[in-house]
Amino acid sequence: MNRPIFIILIGYIIGILWGLYLKISIVFFYIILLILYYISNISKFKKKKFFHYIKILIKFNVLSLIIISSLISNIIIKFQTKKYQNLYHDGEELKIQVEIINNKKEKQYYNRYKIKVLSSKHKDTYLYMTTKKNLEYGEILEIQGNFSEPSEARNYKGFNYKEYLKTLKIYGTIRAEQVKKIDVHKGILYYANKLHLKIKDNLEKTYNSNTMPIVLGVLLGDTSEIDEETREDFSQSSISHVLAVSGLHVSYIIYLSEKSTQGIFGQRKSRIIEILILFIYMAITGFSISVIRSVIMATLMCTAFLVYRKSDTLNNISISAIIILFMNPYNLFSTSFQFTYAGTIGVVFFRPIVEDFIMNIKIKSPCLKEKYTNFCIKHNSFVEEIAVAISAQFMTMPIIITKYNFISLSFIVTNILVGIIIGPLVIGGIIQILVTFLSLKIGTEIAKVVQIPITALSLISKIGTKFPITNFKVITPDTWQIIIYYFIIYIIYYRHKIKKIQKYSFNQKIILKISKYVYSKRKIIIRVFTIILISSIIIKKIPGDLKIYFVDVGQGDCCLIETPKHQKILIDGGGQKNFDIGKNTLLPYLFNRKILEIDYCIISHFDQDHCGGILYILEQIKVKNVIIGKQYEDSTNYNKFKEIVKKQNLNVKIVEAGRRINIEKNLYFDVLWPDSQKMISDNAINNNSLVCKLNYNKFSMLFTGDIEEIAEKEIVSKYENNISILKSTILKTAHHGSKTSSIEKILDVVKPQYAFIGVGENNTFGHPSNITIENLEKRKIKIYRTDKMGEICIKITKRAIININTKLNTS
């Protein structure tokens, strides 16, 4: 059997996925499979085609490896899942002994540490600890505080902090009220961390403040000092991988090690020294997944040399992946794991295909073709750089799109330029680090030279974002689309590989037959896909139900409406002072909902918690129409809005009471407030919020912005002769359920069946008020609130049948 380790990896991944997503027992499934396999070997069934194909496609030794490895990983993941479920309860008070196992991360109001539990039944469990105290790596503490369970995704396909922490093997956070230092554990990792801090201190002394954060990122994988704008530039230019210590860095360390030790100790001893240096480097850089993968693969290559065996790249990749997944099965869902393995597989297996393609580009002119061929032969390293960039990008493309929702076509240029300077940068940087330990003065002089490629790297990241028509925003792909993408990549790879094989194995013959059959039917397959694509477009044009999504944006309001004819309406967008809701929550949410264009954007008023996210959206995607109420007071946000309108050339409609906004047949908004005849000067921005009523057949929803009691009374007074216009099925409770809003008088007039409250979890304003909740409950109005339920999804049929679901299970 070729490459059994790869088969074991496949089985191991199957076991993890099965344990997490399928309720049926994997043991039961394998029993059925083995019975089928046994039947296929009984003579009277041998001629049956169904069982014949089972026997062909599943060899017993392959099946055995998959079963054993998947059962092991399935047991491990189920044990891990059970451990998460039976740990501590949210809010539980703990008194435990712990050890600090990383350096502090400074937050706005506290310091955060990663800790390992040393006492209690949950020994060796990892947690985050928050405290205002300054503590050090290796300190053993006795702490007392409350346990906080990490939050889950609060919106559709939103960021799941709980699942993210699982990839770090962290179970939650303890807010330490009391901290008592007991001892210091001075193990190997303690001294590795001391070395890391010393290197960081030397870098800060020898590099200027502009280049030092990038040097830290490139050489140590420490990106904590890099500002958000620089991160964004590196990401948009498709070169963010240089800030994560990876195989590229490890290869240069191996190169330096070989050159400096081989002449003195010989090849075999130098390999042992290389392994030691790599493990030290791995400890210094903090055991990131990409470094662990690179070091394991390099160690296997060196070990193969020492025992006179040929090293196999696929086996090395598989062994490293199995080790990393054995350490933590949830690493399978880590972006770092996915990037490092997709990129490595792309470079190792797909690069030769890209190189062949570049070398064999068909040019009609014989003269030009000869010149092109000669150029490729003479500049083979240049062709290789292009092939590396393309192959890595092709394999990581679905991950990039899923995480960042953009495609950059400048990646070839930026990665070629980075490929030229990264070698001198890493080698020069490592030499500078070593020399600085001997002489700070000489180290400072070397740093001046290393700063040249660092400055060039920073310049490339900025230029990469400026290329015209190269960066495209894209919606989040579905899982089935990603599977099809990688299946096509695999077919391309296998067809290329199979052409170069003289003698085929049994499995290769089967796969070749399948690929030939697929290729022979390519026209039919293309037609089928075209029909499916056209059908999906037609289906999207068919009128459906009215859908309203009350998005959880923390302490703020945001509502997305999809009309029966699939128009998109966005009402408010939340916003916080210290967190960019638009960038981090609202825009990704729209991409996850397959939205690249908004038909109507309605801003109730220009308080940060209503317009903050909207202002970002207006700059990022196409918005056809913007609707605002008449403004009676200037504000910073309103001035910013006017600048964006001018820059983006947006179509703005200013409305007030009495206006009707027709969206489509049987669906329109009635504007009920503000009224220029009854302008309120007290807290003008809130009390002159745009109040509008969505009408769809027999269903209605009243949007109230942040109006308070004074405005509510004015509205009731204004429509006392036509009070039915205020009656609504759903009330968007004003001002997040504040005690200054939702007076009994307006509740009696609106008579809602449901009340929605957009409010932040554990907010400092005391929203929603107990008085408001009591007033709603007294009238038997069903309450939905984002702090407890997350996103609220409403589906309304033509007959006004309402179906409401929430993201978080509140039972």
Regions found by a protein language model. Name each.
Residues T167-M297, C302-T303, K378, F394, ...:
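Aromatic-rich juxtamembrane segments at the membrane interface
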Residues N625, E712-G790:
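Cap/insert and terminal regions of metallo-dependent hydrolase folds
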Residues Q608-K646, P752:
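Active-site HxH/HxHxD metal-binding segment of metal-dependent hydrolases
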Residues S69-H241, K583-R593, E597, Q631-E633, ...:
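Membrane-interface helix/helix-cap signal primarily in integral membrane proteins
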